[in-house]
UniProtKB/Swiss-Prot annotation:
Its main location: plastid. One of its GO terms (cellular component) is ribonucleoprotein complex. Binds to 23S rRNA. NCBIfam families: PRK05738.2-4 (NF004363), PRK05738.3-4 (NF004368). It comes from the Eukaryota. Belongs to the universal ribosomal protein uL23 family. GO terms for molecular function: rRNA binding; structural constituent of ribosome. Keywords: Chloroplast, Plastid, Ribonucleoprotein, Ribosomal protein, RNA-binding, rRNA-binding. It comes from Emiliania huxleyi (Coccolithophore). This is Large ribosomal subunit protein uL23c.
Length: 99
């Protein structure tokens, strides 16, 4: 598990809003960028505590490191861990309602 000193806001960085995640919202699945060291259990407890919902499942994926070029310099885009959180049918997160 992730260290207990991290707060809930440190685990969940920001919501991910794309066309695909907009379709997933209709299926009651919400996507977040999370701390790379966070595990599924801590992500579940953080979402339940922050949004007062019941989480059914958590799926995670580590995105690969991507190289980006700016002029003649080659840099690296930071890696992100995505979490797709499935909620119980009677729950929803109002933060995503306007998306």
């Amino acid at each position: 598990m992730c260290t207990s000193s991290k707060s809930l806001l440190d685990l969940i960085k920001y919501p991910i809003l794309t066309e695909k995640t907009s379709r997933l919202i209709e299926q009651n699945q919400y996507s977040f960028a999370v701390d790379r060291k966070a595990d599924k259990i801590s992500i579940k407890s953080a979402v339940e505590a922050l949004f007062d919902v019941q989480v059914v499942a958590v799926n995670t994926a580590n995105q690969p490191l991507k190289k980006r070029r700016v002029g003649k310099f080659i840099g690296k885009k930071s890696r992100v861990k995505r979490a797709v959180v499935t909620l119980a049918p009677e729950n929803s997160i109002t933060f995503f309602e306007n998306a």
